[in-house]
Amino acid sequence: MNYLIVGASGATGRLLTEQLLERGHFVKVIVRSPEKLPESVRNHENLTIIRAAVLDLSDAEMAQHVKGCDAVASCLGHNVTFKGMYGHPRKLVTDATRRLCQAIHTNKSDGMTKYVLMNTTANSNRDLNESRTLTEKAVFGLLRLVLPPHVDNEKAADYLRLEIGQNDNLIEWVAVRPDGLVDEDTVTEYELYPSPIVSSLFGSGKTSR
């Protein structure tokens, strides 16, 4: 299969890229700094590197890079620095998701293209009316005011929910909401749930990349 990954130079994106290549898939990555990828990945015969900031690509370039891909994965996130949290682009994840989905629609491929968005348990699924305590609602309301990356994550998922929806004839999407991400030396077991089973604020779990 053919995959396109944005955010491939990040901690999660690197591992996703490595695992897809190890399984024999063909992978394209859009990265600003290819040197951040492990040498074994950079030199892999099945890897195509597009050196660019994803939002700097033209619509035509974006459509060309998406063309022929069975799936697109966004592992984008904001650096945990003052500039990364409060500088531009503030809507990195949302704008990348929107433009990648528009590129898929532009190509009008015969089959469905899968879109995987790495999101966060701090974002609730409004389609499922997930419950939150009054304290949690107050804290998340405050986060929306002071943390632009939190708003970006919410709006990216909302774009998929509201603009792409469940019945799009070209895109099948999922927003993956891991708990606090950690690094383990080996691949560990994991479980999937439609909604968080613990509070993302109080007593949240850990997810190994």
List the predicted regions and their residue ranges.
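Conserved beta-loop-beta element that borders a ligand/cofactor-binding pocket
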Residues: 157-184
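NAD(P)H-binding glycine-rich loop region in Rossmannoid oxidoreductase-like domains
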Residues: 29, 41-99, 103-106
